[in-house]
Each structure stands twice: as C-alpha cells, then as structure tokens.
C-alpha cells in the first residue's frame, strides 16, 4: 500500500476530477496542497454533479477526511460559499470531515482588488497574464513577503490588529500607485471578524494530523490543482500560476516528508489545451482545433473560458514526467480523438534552425519554436466506454503505446468517457 499524488502534466484541465474521484473512493484522507479557488473540477457521483474549486474531492464522500494544506491560499468567503452550495446538495461539511491548516494564508478582499487592478493595467499595455482575478497571486506575494494573515491569526484579534497594519502599509502604497482609494484598518478587521467563527472550527495543525494518519496506515491522496506547466518555476513563465504545482509541492504544501508521497500519477490529456495567455507550440487554429474544443467540451469549470486546443505535445509531457518524478500517467479523453483521419504528436522543436528536445525557459525562445511532428493513422471506431484493451481499435492502442514511448512513462489508467467506470486500469496506484 502506498500514498498517491495526483498532478496535471500539462496546462491544467487534464481531467483530474474524474481520476481523483475514482481514487478518493479508496483513500482515507484527501489533501489539497497548493493553489486556491482559481482552478475547479466537477465530480459526478450517483448522477449528481458537484463543482469544487477549493474543497478537496474527498469532502463529498462519507467517511473520508478532507484536508486543506498550508500550501493553499484560502479565500474564506469563497470557502463558506462552496460549503453552502454543497449543503444544498445534501453534503454536510463539518470539522469532522474537513480540516484546514492553521498556517494557511488567507485571501482578503484587497488581494482580489489588486489582482483586478493589475490585470486592467496590463490589458491596456498588452502584457496581461490572464489571471482569474481571484487574488491568488497577491496572496502568495504577501505570504512570501511575510506579511500574510493566516488562519491561526483569526483566533487572536488583538494581535491581528498589528498584522493588519503591516499588510495595509504595503497594499495602500500599491493602491495609491493605481489611483485607487486606500483601505481602512477597520474595513479589514471587520472583514476578518465576520468570518472568524466560521473558519476557526476547521483549523488544525495539519502536518501533525497527517503524520498520525500515516503512522496509522491511512491511505492518503494528494490532490493537485492546475498543471505542471503552470508551475511558477517549471512552467511557461510569466504565464504561470503563483505557486509550485509539481509533485514535490505535495510535501511542502502539506507538511509531510517527500519520502511519504509514494506513487506520482500524472493526469495527461490525449491532446493539449490551454486557457488564457502564453506560448502553445502545437495550438491549432483550424477546423481540427475547433473539433477538439467542441467534442471535448473545452470550457473552464470555474471561469467558463474557452480553452485553446492543439495536438499532443510529448516534449512538454516528457518534461513534466521528469520534473514531477511521475511514476505513471492517467491518459484521459482518448475518445475525443475518435473519427480523425490522422493524428499528430509533437516530439520536439526547431529553434532558430536547430532541433531541440525540450521547450526552452526563455520567453523569447518559446515564442520562436516550431513543433516537430510524427503523424499516426487515426481510427473511425468509437472508444467511448471502453473498459478493457480488447475494446479499443488497433490504431488507438498504437497511439497510446507511442505516447508511452515518447514521454518515458507507462499508462496506469486510461479514461474513455467522463463516466467514472469507463476506465481501463493497468496499474493500481495505491497498490504499486
């Protein structure tokens, strides 16, 4: 038995929700370790759809413990609203099934406002990143700047007052630069006071809790948000998120040592998508790109934004396999490729006349690369609902084997529809 870390191996939206749902049924504890409420997924259980963006997936299953780790930035208002939506659907979220790290950073209204002001200013200059304007980046900045308000701070309003002064010194200077009204001390104190009683009952020393669970033999599932190519260090900077999204963050963002992480499962879409700005070497602007977007229902769970679509980029996923230490992948949305006459896979790039096998880190170089493709024959038969290899067309199997060879990692699971049972299991990550 081992613990499992789920990471996205592309730019997010790889279909983690279904795979995490499938795994969470067998886990005892499900842990979110990075990000905020800027990335979401939909779980379908007994025909009911649950849309989650901040809460770990385990919260919708009876008897599971959901944990929000210290690596997450928590918008208390968004959390309370999400809990409320689940309660309307009959899911009770209590301190019995949800614990939040007492040292997790809080997202405040001033973070959301700063995020929006920056995006507006960047839009005018043509340099916008395309954030969700939810305050994620500014909250992480305050965390690194050692002026953040954390969950534990809500328990001591007297000490909190000085911390609010400190954060306002920074933010009001920025607001003056944008020509915005300054925020008063009273406004932030009232904001925090209004949610303290709702948030504090969930507060926990999470590293200690997880250590006890591990020693007791619990199966722990670490649930990543977004994708590895959005990692602040290893992604397509500056068009990235504000946290580390690679598997190593599961240790730092939860307080468990890296030796306890276990199987690293990379969720990998059979083609490539991206939301927002940034380089995308295999992007398709033709009818095939439109076909993938429409058939794959490529719209964001949280934002509703249309995703850009392109061919599978093995060079990028190969990088993710290396930077995450991926043990095996879950290949999703293979069925979306049904009916195409031919398929292309990017195996490397040309940069200034030279062939290279990885995407360079330089923003300028990323804009100049041209994909090098191999072409495979497509298939006309349907793969929808396939639950064993024998159900797949020969050309689909050939495509999967080519992906495995090019990225240097085996397929552990193969998803053939949004339904959780339409999955071909090759290797059980929890039993590896």
Curated annotation (Swiss-Prot):
Positions that bind GTP: 12-18, 40-42, 307, 333-335, 415-417
Keywords: Cytoplasm, GTP-binding, Ligase, Magnesium, Metal-binding, Nucleotide-binding, Purine biosynthesis
The keyword Ligase appears for this protein: yes
Stored CDD domains: AdSS
Family membership noted in the UniProt record: Belongs to the adenylosuccinate synthetase family.
Role of this protein: Plays an important role in the de novo pathway of purine nucleotide biosynthesis. Catalyzes the first committed step in the biosynthesis of AMP from IMP.
GO cellular component: cytoplasm
HAMAP family in UniProt: Adenylosucc_synth
Species, as recorded: Agrobacterium fabrum (strain C58 / ATCC 33970)
Cofactor(s), by name: Mg(2+)
Listed name of the protein: Adenylosuccinate synthetase
Residues the entry annotates as binding IMP: 13-16, 38-41, 132, 146, 226, 241, 305
PROSITE patterns found in the cross-reference section: ADENYLOSUCCIN_SYN_1, ADENYLOSUCCIN_SYN_2
InterPro entries in UniProt: Adenylosuccin_syn_GTP-bd, Adenylosuccin_syn_Lys_AS, Adenylosuccinate_synth_dom1, Adenylosuccinate_synth_dom2, Adenylosuccinate_synth_dom3, Adenylosuccinate_synthetase, P-loop_NTPase
List of residues binding Mg(2+): 13, 40
Pathway(s) this gene product operates in, as recorded in its UniProt entry: Purine metabolism; AMP biosynthesis via de novo pathway; AMP from IMP: step 1/2
């Amino acid at each position: 038995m081992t613990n499992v870390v789920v990471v996205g191996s592309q730019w997010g939206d790889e279909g983690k929700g279904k795979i995490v749902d499938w795994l969470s049924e067998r886990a005892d504890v499900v842990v979110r370790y990075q990000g905020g409420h800027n990335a979401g997924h939909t779980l379908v259980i007994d025909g009911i759809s649950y849309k989650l963006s901040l809460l770990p997936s385990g919260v919708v299953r009876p008897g599971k413990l959901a944990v929000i780790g210290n690596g997450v930035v928590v918008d208390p208002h968004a959390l309370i609203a999400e809990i409320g939506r689940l309660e309307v659907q009959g899911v009770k979220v209590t301190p019995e099934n949800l614990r939040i790290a007492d040292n997790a950073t809080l997202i405040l209204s001033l973070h959301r406002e700063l995020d929006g002001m920056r995006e507006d200013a960047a839009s005018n200059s043509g340099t916008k990143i395309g954030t969700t304007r939810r305050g994620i980046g500014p909250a992480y900045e305050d965390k690194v700047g050692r002026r953040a308000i954390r969950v534990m701070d809500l328990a001591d309003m007297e000490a909190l007052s000085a911390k609010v002064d400190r954060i306002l010194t920074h933010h009001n200077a920025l607001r003056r630069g944008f020509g915005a009204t300054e925020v008063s001390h009273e406004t932030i104190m009232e904001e925090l006071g209004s949610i303290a009683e709702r948030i504090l009952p969930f507060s926990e020393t999470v590293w200690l809790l997880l250590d006890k669970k591990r020693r007791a033999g619990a199966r722990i599932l670490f649930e990543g948000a977004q994708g590895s190519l959005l990692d602040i260090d290893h992604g397509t900077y500056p068009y990235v998120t504000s946290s580390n999204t690679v598997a190593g963050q599961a240790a730092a963002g939860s307080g468990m040592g890296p030796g306890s992480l276990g199987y690293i499962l990379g969720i990998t879409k059979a083609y490539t998508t991206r939301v927002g700005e940034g380089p995308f070497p295999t992007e398709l602007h033709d009818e095939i790109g439109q076909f993938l977007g429409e058939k794959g229902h490529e719209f964001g769970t949280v934002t509703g934004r249309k995703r850009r679509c392109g061919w599978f980029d093995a060079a990028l996923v190969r990088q993710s396999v290396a930077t995450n230490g991926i043990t095996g992948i879950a290949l999703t949305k293979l069925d979306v490729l049904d009916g195409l006459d031919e398929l292309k896979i990017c195996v490397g790039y040309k940069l200034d006349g030279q062939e290279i096998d990885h995407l360079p880190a330089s923003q300028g170089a990323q804009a100049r690369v041209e994909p090098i493709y191999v072409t495979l024959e497509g298939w006309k038969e349907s793969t929808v609902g396939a639950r064993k290899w024998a159900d797949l067309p020969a050309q689909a199997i050939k495509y999967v084997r080519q992906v495995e060879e090019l990225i240097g990692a085996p397929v552990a699971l193969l998803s053939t529809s949004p339904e959780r049972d339409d999955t071909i299991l090759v290797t059980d990550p929890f039993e590896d």
